[in-house]
Structure formats: structure tokens, C-alpha cells
UniProtKB/Swiss-Prot annotation:
This is Transcription factor GATA-3. It is found in: Nucleus. It comes from Danio rerio. It holds the Pfam family GATA. Residues 122-142, 232-241 have a biased composition (Low complexity).
Amino acid sequence: MEVSPEQHRWVTHHTVGQHPETHHPGLGHSYMDPSQYQLAEDVDVLFNIDGQSNHPYYGNPVRAVQRYPPPPHSSQMCRPSLLHGSLPWLDGGKSIGPHHSTSPWNLGPFPKTSLHHSSPGPLSVYPPASSSSLSAGHSSPHLFTFPPTPPKDVSPDPAISTSGSGSSVRQEDKECIKYQVSLAESMKLDSAHSRSMASIGAGASSAHHPIATYPSYVPDYGPGLFPPSSLIGGSSSSYGSKTRPKTRSSSEGRECVNCGATSTPLWRRDGTGHYLCNACGLYHKMNGQNRPLIKPKRRLSAARRAGTSCANCQTTTTTLWRRNANGDPVCNACGLYYKLHNINRPLTMKKEGIQTRNRKMSSKSKKSKKSHDSMEDFSKSLMEKNSSFSPAALSRHMTSFPPFSHSGHMLTTPTPMHPSSSLPFASHHPSSMVTAMG
């Protein structure tokens, strides 16, 4: 079997060149001593599935050398320690076929199959829904950027499945990028954000996690999460302002049959069904009779009672009449003095005029007045700024702020609960939903 230039370039690595004594004298440059292979740990990790039942068999030493992975310094190296042979979604009926191209990536470390080129019916770890994504993820340098749940309407492309040419690899990369961008657009993400997240996730997944843990089965958030602007105040038909009832009802020409009032906060009825104003109706309800229309005459004030004089100082004018212990009427000054000192007020303290003083406003009344003034000022300020507090303005302000995602960055749309396959997650994102949900 002839060895292509790519095989020769891959096999003659610097490790072989540094140790010329390992070259076999009879097999040329394409043979390397088996003692130089990393068989202790790396091969056990990469071929842990093959070690269970099927053992590799190589037809010639060139193909045996080709089956081993590149040195550990390669940036595309990935060791899948998460996969096991008991995965429930392995499909034995589908086969990826014997891809024996000259690329070092032609053999994935996952399939549980014999490594001989004529081995029939190998198992596949890829979902059997799409063969184009299977072949792209199998032979592309970006080995593990395939989505876990590709769409079913993707048809196999023979140009992609053919291996062994550089144009095929580039075309496969373009197809992977197109598929990732289409998934990002289906999630309604911003174009710039989707491109940055897709590039970050692709590099991170090829270095950390080969397969996304959660499939993209969670639907995107629909418009039901955020109410439309019409509900907030965009249209007057949704939240129609109810007309407040008039404070003083004067419709239909109603008139109180008792006092003749035409305006009242609340119209009532008497026993015969006639309309009464609120005052007459309450009076009739409480007393059982009609409310009197003529107010009774106020009795004379205590200061002007005829024939009344103070029993102590004989004065006839006072602001308030009091009574002493014997029941005799006394003026306000004599009554207070006796109440405080238990003796009659001396006559030397009598004055012709009534001494009055300017009463200071109590603290309670001051507080009530201040609160009333502050409420008036606040209502005036609200009336002046009424346009800024309208529902339409509030809706504009609310829609101008995008929602926050779980990572603290402002996104244009809410992020789904589980990351999609187009945005693979990595372990260097401490605020991802996967680590938060356990």
C-alpha cells in the first residue's frame, strides 16, 4: 500500500526526528517503534470502549501507525472521558462507514468497532437522524461541534461525506457554521451576540465537553412572557379609564321633598319612595321623622346671662361660668383659683377687664397642617408632571430597558433554561445555568 504525502508528513513527527535510533532499518520513515507510543494512559482513555469486546487488528504497519492519535501538544486533541459503552442513544443499526482517508482525524475514538478496514457493521455514537452532520463531525478538524439533536430534514450530501480532500474539509466547516447560525437565529438572539457566543462555545466545547449535556428541547420564550405595549398603555381600548361618578349628583332634575335641595352627594328615598337628600334621608332614618328645616335659636352665652353674678367677686362678665363647692355660680377666674388652691380667690386680684391671651397652636394641629400642605404640594407637582407619568410614557420607559440574563449581562431576549446546541457551554463559565442547576 502506498503512503500519501499527508501520511508521510503526519508520521514523520518531530518526536520521530529527534530519536533517529527508533527508526526501523527495514521499513523506512513511515514506521516507528511501538515503545514510543503513548500506550499507558492516552490509548486507554481514547479506546476505552474498544477494550471491552472488540480488539483492533491492523493489516499493515502503516495503518497501525495511522490509528494512533497525534501528540499531546496538538490544539485539536480531545479526550472524551464522559462517554461510556452503556449510553442509551447508541444506534447499532446505523454505521458511519469505513472512512479510511489520509487525514489523521478519520477515526473517532468513540465507535465501538473493530479497527480493521473491512470490519462490517460498526456502532455509531452519533444520533442517527442526520448523516451529513455525522460525516461532518467525523472528519472535520472541529471534531465535536456537531449538535446533539440535528434537524431531520437535512439530507445527506455526498460532497460532504467524501473524505481525503482539503476542499471537503472547508465545505464541512462552512456547513457547521451555517447550521450553528441557523439555530442561533431560530432562538431569536441578536446576530452579533449569536456569532460571538457560537465561536466561544465551539472552541470551548472542543476543549472541554465533546457533547452538550442538555438537548435543545426547551422552546424559546414566546411573546407571552412580556405583555405587548398595548396592554401597558399603548391603546386606550385595552385599559379604558372608567368614568368616575360625579361627586354631587344633579341629574334628572331631582329635588329633596323635605328641604328642596337639588345637589347632594347621595340621593336617598323615604318610606313613600320620594327622593331625599343625604342629610334629610339620614335624619329620617335615625330619628324616624323629617329633618326640621328651621334651626332652633341658640341660647344666650353664659357670659350674657341676665342676673348672674359671681358669688366671690360679684362680677357679671366672664367667659365661662363655674360653680363652687356649695353650688353657687362663680366666674371663670374665681372657679379656677379655687380649683387649684382650694381657697377662694382674693378680691385684690380682681380686674375690670377680662384678660385674654393669644393661644398658641398645639403640636397636633401643627402636624396636621404641615401634612395637609405637603399633600397639596405633592398633588400640584403630580399635576404638573402628569404627562411624564402617563401609561404611554411608562410603556416607552419599560420597553427601553432590556431584560437581564442569569449572567448579569443585558440581552435583547430572555435566555432559555437549557443552553442550545448552537451555544455550547464550557466549564470556564461560572454563571452558566447548567452549573447553577446542578
